[in-house]
Amino acid sequence: VETGKLGIDARWEIDIFGRQKAKSRAASNSLQASQADLYSTWVSLSAETALQYMSLRTLQEQLRITEDDVKRQQEALELIKINNQSGIINELPVQQATYALSQTQAEIPSLKKNIASTMAALSILTGTVPGEIDGLLMENTSLPTVNPHIFIGIPAEALRQRPDIQAAERRIAAQQQKTKAAKADLKPRFSLNGSIGLESFSSGGLISAIGKMIGIGPSITMPIFNAGAIRKNIKVQTEKEQEYLALYEETVLKAVGEVRNAVTDASQDHIKSEELKSAVESAQQAESLAQTNFDSGLSDYLSVLDARRNVLSARRQYIMSRGQEFADTVRLFKSLGGGWEAMDMDQEAEADSHAKK
């Protein structure tokens, strides 16, 4: 007589002390910490793209005002040559104006080279073929404006949307659940064991009977021989939890410092831009007066050139300051985790961060 069996065995652990639930929550929080790390990378990439974009607009604006100044100097040089040929003035102003024009024209190739390299960097950051977005970047070369009111009244709660803080919170929550699961290992485990299948009996090569086989019963497992190892693991998990708490505090303090510095830089550079704007206006008035004095024979042409250089220098400083102001704003938003809109996180995970051990 021969017997044969075919069936399925199953075991279901009754999670009385929350061991399996704690493990599941720990895995969920660890996943969300990884998602926050990924979001942090996205914020850094977006900020770098914005900074490169603003650098491009600053260079383009510098090129525009330099080319504009070249045209003005060329017109002035033509007028000076006419006056020289008429005997009104001598050769000195002609040479001075020619020298100044050549100096200004020499700056254009460097600006164009920097513009090309910045466009290439933007192509890399946006994942496009070099040259593909150049036409788009040349359509509107004006500098973006910055609203100074965004530096006022930043809510403290905005810090919690920083991905590094969110990741630190999720890791604390995950470690709390791991500690909870480790403590549950000291408790007995209750489970139900079940099996279902078919059993056959045969004699002489002929199947004589086929019957159903069903079995179910409870079981209990006690940590008798490995209790010492479990207690060691509990100690390890508890120490890790303290490490994550210390890391969280360090992350928060770092975030507060970064936001404070970003706000200070942005607000002070805005004040600097306003002062430089006034400086440009004063330099333009001084240039007009110098030109009038030269036309009246009250001063030489060198004073006109000095005044014109001051205008160009003031305009460049103003453009660079506006670019720096925008860069400060980008860094401010980066320090806030990409803005004031909180990252979309699972609502249940928020409750998990306050779960008890």
Label each residue range with its predicted role.
Residues 3-5, 51, 96, 153, ...:
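Transmembrane beta-barrel architecture of outer-membrane proteins
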Residues 68-71, 88-90, 109-159, 300, ...:
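Short, solvent-exposed, mixed-charge loop/turn linkers that connect secondary-structure elements
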